[in-house]
Structure formats: C-alpha cells, structure tokens
Amino acid sequence: MQENMKEYFSEKEARERRLATYTEKIQETVLNKSAETIRSLVDERYNQKMTQQEISDITGIKPSNLARFESGGRVPTLIVLEKYANALGKHIEIKICDD
C-alpha cells in the first residue's frame, strides 16, 4: 500500500511539473503575440497621427489603461484589442496555425 502511495505522489508531482512547464510556454507565447499585436496597433496609431486621448474618446478605454498596455505593463483582452483596432479602422484577426 505504501509503495502505491509513493508511486501515486511521484506521478502526481511529475504531472504538476509538466503542467507548469506547459502553462509557462503558453503564457510566453500569448505575451509575445500580444506584444506584437500591440506594437502593430501603436505603429498604426502613430501613422494616423492619433493620440491615446483620441483612441480613448472613441473606445471608452481610459488613457491610463491604454498607456499601460502600450508600454507592456498589462496584457489587454481581445475585446480591448478589437476596440483599439476598430478606432483605427482596422480589426483583429485570429488564426489557428500549426506549431
């Protein structure tokens, strides 16, 4: 019985480590993709000579929140990204790709 418990806890710890590694990988991917999208939106905002305040007025997103995610201090939701893109006459497109 004790051997089964040791095996159970050993397998449980291994699963938890695999899950933690997987979660970290996914979080890193999401952060990188979000950063790329935000950079594209900010570049487009500059190209259109729009200020954060103008984006805020159109979208209702507080300028402080815009500043936070433009600087990488916060990861915006997909809804916030779409609002921002829409204010620039653009939209967000999501694709499913192979690894």
Describe the predicted segments one by one.
Residues 95-99:
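Short, charged recognition helix plus adjacent turn
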Residues 2-6, 10, 39-56, 83:
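Short basic helix-loop element that most often maps to the first helix and adjoining turn
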Residues 79-94:
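DNA major-groove recognition helix of helix-turn-helix/homeodomain DNA-binding modules
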Residues 1-40:
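N-terminal flexible/basic segments that precede or flank functional cores
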Residues 59-75:
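Recognition helix of helix-turn-helix/homeodomain-like DNA-binding domains
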Residues 36, 76-79:
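Charged, alpha-helix-enriched surfaces in structured cytosolic catalytic cores
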